[in-house]
Protein backbone atom coordinates (compact mmCIF):
# COMPACT_ATOMS: atom_id res chain seq x y z
CA UNK A 1 0.00 0.00 0.00
CA UNK A 2 1.13 3.54 -0.79
CA UNK A 3 0.10 6.67 1.08
CA UNK A 4 0.11 10.19 -0.35
CA UNK A 5 -0.65 12.99 2.10
CA UNK A 6 -2.53 16.16 1.15
CA UNK A 7 -0.99 18.90 3.30
CA UNK A 8 -3.32 21.84 3.87
CA UNK A 9 -2.70 24.93 5.97
CA UNK A 10 -4.73 23.73 8.94
CA UNK A 11 -4.77 19.95 8.51
CA UNK A 12 -3.74 17.02 6.37
CA UNK A 13 -5.45 13.89 5.07
CA UNK A 14 -4.17 10.65 3.55
CA UNK A 15 -4.77 9.08 0.16
CA UNK A 16 -4.38 5.31 0.53
CA UNK A 17 -3.52 3.47 -2.71
CA UNK A 18 -3.39 -0.30 -2.94
CA UNK A 19 -5.04 -3.57 -3.91
CA UNK A 20 -7.80 -5.07 -1.76
CA UNK A 21 -8.27 -2.06 0.52
CA UNK A 22 -12.09 -2.11 0.42
CA UNK A 23 -12.37 -5.45 2.21
CA UNK A 24 -9.86 -4.51 4.93
CA UNK A 25 -11.62 -3.08 7.99
CA UNK A 26 -8.40 -1.28 8.93
CA UNK A 27 -8.90 1.01 5.94
CA UNK A 28 -11.78 2.76 7.70
CA UNK A 29 -10.83 4.80 10.80
CA UNK A 30 -14.37 5.07 12.17
CA UNK A 31 -15.03 4.39 15.83
CA UNK A 32 -17.21 1.52 17.05
CA UNK A 33 -20.86 2.51 16.96
CA UNK A 34 -20.20 5.29 14.44
CA UNK A 35 -22.96 6.11 11.97
CA UNK A 36 -22.18 5.82 8.26
CA UNK A 37 -24.15 6.70 5.13
CA UNK A 38 -22.76 5.15 1.95
CA UNK A 39 -23.72 7.00 -1.23
CA UNK A 40 -23.35 4.91 -4.38
CA UNK A 41 -25.20 3.84 -7.53
CA UNK A 42 -26.61 0.47 -8.67
CA UNK A 43 -23.70 -0.20 -11.04
CA UNK A 44 -21.06 0.14 -8.33
CA UNK A 45 -23.27 -1.37 -5.62
CA UNK A 46 -23.50 -4.74 -7.36
CA UNK A 47 -19.72 -5.13 -7.13
CA UNK A 48 -18.61 -3.35 -3.95
CA UNK A 49 -21.41 -2.25 -1.63
CA UNK A 50 -21.62 -5.50 0.35
CA UNK A 51 -17.83 -5.60 0.69
CA UNK A 52 -17.68 -2.12 2.19
CA UNK A 53 -20.68 -2.71 4.47
CA UNK A 54 -19.16 -5.96 5.75
CA UNK A 55 -15.82 -4.29 6.54
CA UNK A 56 -17.54 -1.40 8.33
CA UNK A 57 -19.81 -3.68 10.34
CA UNK A 58 -16.75 -5.67 11.43
CA UNK A 59 -15.57 -2.40 12.97
CA UNK A 60 -18.90 -2.08 14.77
CA UNK A 61 -20.28 0.73 12.60
CA UNK A 62 -23.98 1.29 11.97
CA UNK A 63 -24.32 1.50 8.20
CA UNK A 64 -27.03 2.90 5.94
CA UNK A 65 -26.82 3.43 2.20
CA UNK A 66 -28.58 5.35 -0.54
CA UNK A 67 -28.53 4.54 -4.26
CA UNK A 68 -28.46 7.38 -6.77
CA UNK A 69 -29.24 6.98 -10.48
CA UNK A 70 -26.10 6.29 -12.50
CA UNK A 71 -24.66 8.87 -14.88
CA UNK A 72 -23.60 12.47 -15.37
CA UNK A 73 -27.14 13.56 -16.23
CA UNK A 74 -28.12 12.72 -12.63
CA UNK A 75 -25.51 15.03 -11.09
CA UNK A 76 -28.33 17.30 -10.00
CA UNK A 77 -30.01 19.01 -7.08
CA UNK A 78 -32.62 16.24 -7.23
CA UNK A 79 -29.97 13.60 -6.53
CA UNK A 80 -28.55 15.77 -3.77
CA UNK A 81 -31.97 15.89 -2.17
CA UNK A 82 -32.21 12.09 -2.24
CA UNK A 83 -29.14 11.98 0.01
CA UNK A 84 -30.56 14.59 2.39
CA UNK A 85 -33.83 12.65 2.62
CA UNK A 86 -32.01 9.40 3.43
CA UNK A 87 -29.91 11.15 6.09
CA UNK A 88 -32.94 12.74 7.72
CA UNK A 89 -35.07 9.60 7.58
CA UNK A 90 -32.20 7.70 9.20
CA UNK A 91 -31.83 10.33 11.94
CA UNK A 92 -28.19 10.95 11.06
CA UNK A 93 -26.54 13.70 13.08
CA UNK A 94 -23.43 15.81 12.79
CA UNK A 95 -21.30 12.90 13.94
CA UNK A 96 -22.16 10.76 10.90
CA UNK A 97 -19.71 9.92 8.12
CA UNK A 98 -20.70 10.06 4.46
CA UNK A 99 -18.80 7.63 2.23
CA UNK A 100 -18.81 8.36 -1.50
CA UNK A 101 -18.46 4.96 -3.20
CA UNK A 102 -18.28 5.43 -6.95
CA UNK A 103 -16.94 7.59 -9.73
CA UNK A 104 -16.78 11.32 -10.19
CA UNK A 105 -20.53 11.92 -10.16
CA UNK A 106 -21.01 10.10 -6.86
CA UNK A 107 -17.97 11.81 -5.37
CA UNK A 108 -19.16 15.26 -6.38
CA UNK A 109 -22.77 14.86 -5.24
CA UNK A 110 -21.96 13.01 -2.01
CA UNK A 111 -19.21 15.52 -1.28
CA UNK A 112 -21.60 18.43 -1.71
CA UNK A 113 -24.08 16.65 0.57
CA UNK A 114 -21.37 16.25 3.22
CA UNK A 115 -20.50 19.94 2.92
CA UNK A 116 -24.14 20.96 3.27
CA UNK A 117 -25.81 18.52 5.68
CA UNK A 118 -26.08 20.15 9.10
CA UNK A 119 -23.36 22.57 7.88
CA UNK A 120 -20.82 19.83 7.36
CA UNK A 121 -20.20 16.18 8.26
CA UNK A 122 -17.21 13.90 7.80
CA UNK A 123 -16.53 12.68 4.26
CA UNK A 124 -14.55 9.69 2.99
CA UNK A 125 -14.01 9.34 -0.75
CA UNK A 126 -13.74 5.83 -2.24
CA UNK A 127 -13.31 6.45 -5.99
CA UNK A 128 -13.93 3.44 -8.22
CA UNK A 129 -13.07 4.88 -11.66
CA UNK A 130 -9.63 5.84 -12.92
CA UNK A 131 -10.75 9.42 -13.54
CA UNK A 132 -12.02 9.86 -10.00
CA UNK A 133 -8.98 8.12 -8.51
CA UNK A 134 -6.48 10.44 -10.18
CA UNK A 135 -8.51 13.63 -10.12
CA UNK A 136 -11.97 14.36 -8.81
CA UNK A 137 -11.76 12.55 -5.44
CA UNK A 138 -8.68 14.56 -4.41
CA UNK A 139 -8.76 18.23 -3.51
CA UNK A 140 -12.23 18.95 -2.19
CA UNK A 141 -14.16 20.17 -5.20
CA UNK A 142 -17.84 19.18 -4.90
CA UNK A 143 -20.73 20.24 -7.12
CA UNK A 144 -23.84 19.48 -9.08
CA UNK A 145 -24.64 20.59 -12.61
CA UNK A 146 -27.15 23.13 -13.87
CA UNK A 147 -28.74 22.83 -17.29
CA UNK A 148 -26.87 26.00 -18.29
CA UNK A 149 -23.46 24.92 -17.02
CA UNK A 150 -21.40 22.13 -15.49
CA UNK A 151 -20.43 22.22 -11.79
CA UNK A 152 -22.11 25.58 -11.25
CA UNK A 153 -23.53 24.79 -7.80
CA UNK A 154 -21.07 23.47 -5.24
CA UNK A 155 -18.47 24.02 -2.56
CA UNK A 156 -14.86 23.33 -1.64
CA UNK A 157 -15.02 20.61 1.01
CA UNK A 158 -12.08 18.35 1.79
CA UNK A 159 -12.53 14.66 2.65
CA UNK A 160 -11.00 13.21 5.79
CA UNK A 161 -9.35 10.56 3.63
CA UNK A 162 -9.38 8.96 0.17
CA UNK A 163 -9.25 5.17 -0.27
CA UNK A 164 -8.15 4.01 -3.73
CA UNK A 165 -8.49 0.27 -4.30
CA UNK A 166 -6.96 -0.45 -7.70
CA UNK A 167 -8.93 -3.72 -7.97
CA UNK A 168 -12.05 -1.66 -8.71
CA UNK A 169 -10.62 -0.86 -12.14
CA UNK A 170 -11.03 -4.52 -13.14
CA UNK A 171 -14.81 -4.06 -13.34
CA UNK A 172 -14.61 -0.70 -15.14
CA UNK A 173 -15.72 -0.58 -18.80
CA UNK A 174 -12.84 0.08 -21.20
CA UNK A 175 -14.39 3.36 -22.29
CA UNK A 176 -14.30 4.58 -18.68
CA UNK A 177 -10.67 3.51 -18.31
CA UNK A 178 -9.74 5.44 -21.43
CA UNK A 179 -11.64 8.50 -20.21
CA UNK A 180 -9.63 8.44 -17.00
CA UNK A 181 -6.40 8.41 -18.97
CA UNK A 182 -7.26 11.86 -20.32
CA UNK A 183 -6.83 13.32 -16.83
CA UNK A 184 -3.65 11.27 -16.36
CA UNK A 185 -2.14 12.70 -19.56
CA UNK A 186 -3.21 16.18 -18.47
CA UNK A 187 -0.94 16.02 -15.41
CA UNK A 188 2.10 15.33 -17.55
CA UNK A 189 1.15 18.01 -20.05
CA UNK A 190 0.74 20.79 -17.48
CA UNK A 191 3.28 20.12 -14.74
CA UNK A 192 5.56 17.11 -15.21
CA UNK A 193 7.43 16.56 -18.47
CA UNK A 194 9.20 13.47 -17.09
CA UNK A 195 5.82 11.93 -16.30
CA UNK A 196 4.63 12.79 -19.83
CA UNK A 197 7.65 10.92 -21.22
CA UNK A 198 6.90 7.99 -18.89
CA UNK A 199 3.34 7.91 -20.23
CA UNK A 200 4.61 7.81 -23.82
CA UNK A 201 6.55 4.68 -22.85
CA UNK A 202 3.86 2.99 -20.72
CA UNK A 203 0.45 4.08 -22.05
CA UNK A 204 -0.21 0.64 -23.58
CA UNK A 205 0.34 -0.97 -20.16
CA UNK A 206 -2.13 1.45 -18.58
CA UNK A 207 -4.75 0.71 -21.24
CA UNK A 208 -4.23 -2.99 -20.46
CA UNK A 209 -4.57 -2.30 -16.68
CA UNK A 210 -1.10 -3.52 -15.77
CA UNK A 211 -1.14 -3.41 -11.93
CA UNK A 212 2.38 -2.05 -11.42
CA UNK A 213 1.98 0.64 -14.07
CA UNK A 214 -1.41 1.62 -12.65
CA UNK A 215 -0.16 1.97 -9.09
CA UNK A 216 2.76 4.14 -10.19
CA UNK A 217 0.49 6.23 -12.41
CA UNK A 218 -2.21 6.79 -9.78
CA UNK A 219 0.26 7.64 -7.03
CA UNK A 220 2.13 10.11 -9.26
CA UNK A 221 -1.10 11.84 -10.31
CA UNK A 222 -2.29 12.05 -6.71
CA UNK A 223 1.06 13.48 -5.61
CA UNK A 224 0.97 16.14 -8.32
CA UNK A 225 -2.56 17.13 -7.41
CA UNK A 226 -1.84 17.02 -3.67
CA UNK A 227 1.09 19.39 -4.17
CA UNK A 228 -1.05 21.81 -6.18
CA UNK A 229 -3.95 21.71 -3.70
CA UNK A 230 -1.54 22.32 -0.80
CA UNK A 231 -0.39 25.54 -2.50
CA UNK A 232 -3.83 26.67 -3.66
CA UNK A 233 -6.79 24.95 -2.00
CA UNK A 234 -9.57 27.15 -3.44
CA UNK A 235 -8.24 27.79 -6.95
CA UNK A 236 -6.99 31.34 -6.60
CA UNK A 237 -3.72 30.59 -8.42
CA UNK A 238 -1.86 27.48 -9.60
CA UNK A 239 -4.80 25.13 -9.12
CA UNK A 240 -6.45 26.64 -12.19
CA UNK A 241 -3.76 24.90 -14.26
CA UNK A 242 -5.50 21.59 -13.51
CA UNK A 243 -8.27 22.78 -15.83
CA UNK A 244 -6.32 22.33 -19.07
CA UNK A 245 -8.90 21.44 -21.72
CA UNK A 246 -11.79 21.76 -19.31
CA UNK A 247 -13.28 25.03 -20.57
CA UNK A 248 -13.56 23.58 -24.08
CA UNK A 249 -14.56 20.19 -22.67
CA UNK A 250 -17.32 21.53 -20.46
CA UNK A 251 -18.76 23.28 -23.53
CA UNK A 252 -18.92 19.92 -25.29
CA UNK A 253 -20.59 18.21 -22.32
CA UNK A 254 -23.15 20.97 -21.85
CA UNK A 255 -23.98 21.31 -25.55
CA UNK A 256 -24.36 17.57 -26.21
CA UNK A 257 -26.21 16.90 -22.95
CA UNK A 258 -24.49 15.54 -19.86
CA UNK A 259 -23.34 11.97 -20.31
CA UNK A 260 -23.33 11.72 -24.10
CA UNK A 261 -19.59 12.24 -24.04
CA UNK A 262 -17.75 11.14 -20.92
CA UNK A 263 -15.94 13.90 -19.05
CA UNK A 264 -12.52 12.53 -19.94
CA UNK A 265 -13.45 12.28 -23.61
CA UNK A 266 -14.50 15.93 -23.65
CA UNK A 267 -11.33 16.96 -21.79
CA UNK A 268 -9.22 15.06 -24.33
CA UNK A 269 -10.62 17.04 -27.23
CA UNK A 270 -10.46 20.18 -25.09
CA UNK A 271 -6.75 19.62 -24.49
CA UNK A 272 -6.16 19.39 -28.23
CA UNK A 273 -8.01 22.68 -28.72
CA UNK A 274 -5.94 24.29 -25.97
CA UNK A 275 -2.75 22.93 -27.55
CA UNK A 276 -3.79 24.21 -30.98
CA UNK A 277 -4.45 27.65 -29.49
CA UNK A 278 -1.11 27.57 -27.68
CA UNK A 279 0.63 26.84 -30.97
CA UNK A 280 -1.30 29.68 -32.67
CA UNK A 281 0.02 32.03 -29.98
CA UNK A 282 3.60 30.93 -30.61
CA UNK A 283 4.05 28.98 -27.38
CA UNK A 284 4.11 25.22 -27.87
CA UNK A 285 5.73 23.71 -30.96
CA UNK A 286 3.75 21.88 -33.62
CA UNK A 287 5.89 18.82 -32.84
CA UNK A 288 4.70 18.84 -29.21
CA UNK A 289 1.09 19.29 -30.33
CA UNK A 290 1.57 16.16 -32.42
CA UNK A 291 3.07 14.27 -29.45
CA UNK A 292 0.04 15.12 -27.33
CA UNK A 293 -2.35 14.08 -30.10
CA UNK A 294 -0.57 10.75 -30.60
CA UNK A 295 -0.59 9.96 -26.88
CA UNK A 296 -4.31 10.70 -26.58
CA UNK A 297 -5.01 8.57 -29.66
CA UNK A 298 -3.04 5.65 -28.17
CA UNK A 299 -5.35 5.91 -25.15
CA UNK A 300 -8.32 5.56 -27.55
CA UNK A 301 -9.47 9.11 -26.84
CA UNK A 302 -11.09 11.62 -29.23
CA UNK A 303 -9.00 14.54 -30.44
CA UNK A 304 -11.54 16.33 -32.64
CA UNK A 305 -14.81 18.12 -31.98
CA UNK A 306 -18.11 16.19 -32.05
CA UNK A 307 -19.50 16.29 -35.57
CA UNK A 308 -22.77 17.75 -34.24
CA UNK A 309 -21.02 20.88 -32.89
CA UNK A 310 -19.97 23.91 -34.90
CA UNK A 311 -17.08 26.12 -33.74
CA UNK A 312 -19.54 28.93 -33.02
CA UNK A 313 -21.40 26.66 -30.57
CA UNK A 314 -18.51 26.74 -28.10
CA UNK A 315 -18.15 30.35 -27.03
CA UNK A 316 -21.60 30.88 -25.43
CA UNK A 317 -20.91 27.91 -23.14
CA UNK A 318 -17.29 28.91 -22.52
CA UNK A 319 -18.28 32.41 -21.42
CA UNK A 320 -20.21 30.82 -18.51
CA UNK A 321 -17.04 29.12 -17.28
CA UNK A 322 -16.12 29.75 -13.65
CA UNK A 323 -12.72 31.12 -14.67
CA UNK A 324 -14.29 33.99 -16.64
CA UNK A 325 -13.57 37.27 -14.83
CA UNK A 326 -15.20 40.61 -15.67
CA UNK A 327 -16.55 39.12 -18.87
CA UNK A 328 -13.09 38.06 -20.07
CA UNK A 329 -12.34 34.50 -21.15
CA UNK A 330 -9.43 32.92 -19.25
CA UNK A 331 -7.94 29.71 -20.60
CA UNK A 332 -5.28 27.27 -19.46
CA UNK A 333 -2.70 26.95 -22.24
CA UNK A 334 0.71 25.32 -22.73
CA UNK A 335 4.09 27.03 -22.87
CA UNK A 336 5.56 23.60 -23.58
CA UNK A 337 4.85 20.03 -22.59
CA UNK A 338 5.10 20.03 -18.81
CA UNK A 339 4.52 23.77 -18.41
CA UNK A 340 1.09 25.44 -18.43
CA UNK A 341 -0.14 28.97 -17.78
CA UNK A 342 -3.40 30.91 -17.57
CA UNK A 343 -4.03 33.23 -20.53
CA UNK A 344 -6.22 36.23 -19.79
CA UNK A 345 -8.68 37.64 -22.33
CA UNK A 346 -7.63 35.58 -25.35
CA UNK A 347 -9.12 36.95 -28.58
CA UNK A 348 -12.23 35.03 -29.56
CA UNK A 349 -11.09 34.88 -33.18
CA UNK A 350 -8.00 32.92 -32.13
CA UNK A 351 -10.11 30.62 -29.97
CA UNK A 352 -12.41 29.90 -32.91
CA UNK A 353 -9.43 29.23 -35.17
CA UNK A 354 -8.11 26.67 -32.69
CA UNK A 355 -11.51 24.98 -32.47
CA UNK A 356 -11.72 24.84 -36.27
CA UNK A 357 -8.35 23.09 -36.37
CA UNK A 358 -9.90 20.37 -34.20
CA UNK A 359 -13.10 20.01 -36.21
CA UNK A 360 -13.89 16.78 -38.06
CA UNK A 361 -13.55 16.90 -41.83
CA UNK A 362 -14.64 14.24 -44.29
Swiss-Prot record:
Keywords: Amino-acid biosynthesis, Aromatic amino acid biosynthesis, Cobalt, Cytoplasm, Lyase, Metal-binding, NAD, Nucleotide-binding, Zinc. GO terms for molecular function: 3-dehydroquinate synthase activity; metal ion binding; nucleotide binding. NAD(+) binds at residues 70-75, 104-108, 128-129, 141, 150, 168-171. Its main location: cytoplasm. One of its GO terms (biological process) is chorismate biosynthetic process. GO terms for cellular component: cytoplasm. Zn(2+) binds at residues 183, 246, 263. Its EC number is 4.2.3.4. Binds 1 divalent metal cation per subunit. Can use either Co(2+) or Zn(2+). Gene3D superfamilies: 3.40.50.1970, Dehydroquinate synthase-like - alpha domain. It catalyses: 7-phospho-2-dehydro-3-deoxy-D-arabino-heptonate = 3-dehydroquinate + phosphate. InterPro entries: Dehydroquinate_synthase (IPR050071), DHQ_synth_AroB (IPR016037), DHQ_synth_fam (IPR030963), DHQS/DOIS_N (IPR030960), DHQS_C (IPR056179). Its cofactor is Co(2+); Zn(2+); NAD(+). Pathway: Metabolic intermediate biosynthesis; chorismate biosynthesis; chorismate from D-erythrose 4-phosphate and phosphoenolpyruvate: step 2/7. It is found in: Cytoplasm. Catalyzes the conversion of 3-deoxy-D-arabino-heptulosonate 7-phosphate (DAHP) to dehydroquinate (DHQ). Belongs to the sugar phosphate cyclases superfamily. Dehydroquinate synthase family. HAMAP family: DHQ_synthase. This is 3-dehydroquinate synthase. It comes from Haemophilus influenzae (strain PittEE). The lineage of its organism: Bacteria, Pseudomonadati, Pseudomonadota, Gammaproteobacteria, Pasteurellales.
Amino acid sequence: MLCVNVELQERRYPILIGSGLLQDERSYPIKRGGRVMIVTNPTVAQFYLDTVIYALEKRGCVVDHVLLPDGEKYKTLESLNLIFTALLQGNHGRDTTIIALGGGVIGDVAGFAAASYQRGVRLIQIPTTLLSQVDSSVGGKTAVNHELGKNMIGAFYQPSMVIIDTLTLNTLPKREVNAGLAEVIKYGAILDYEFFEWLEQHIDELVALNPEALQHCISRCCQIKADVVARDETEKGDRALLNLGHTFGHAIETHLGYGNWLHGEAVSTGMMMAAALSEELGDISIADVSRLEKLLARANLPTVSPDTMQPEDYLPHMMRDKKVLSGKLRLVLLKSLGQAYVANDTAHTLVLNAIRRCTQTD
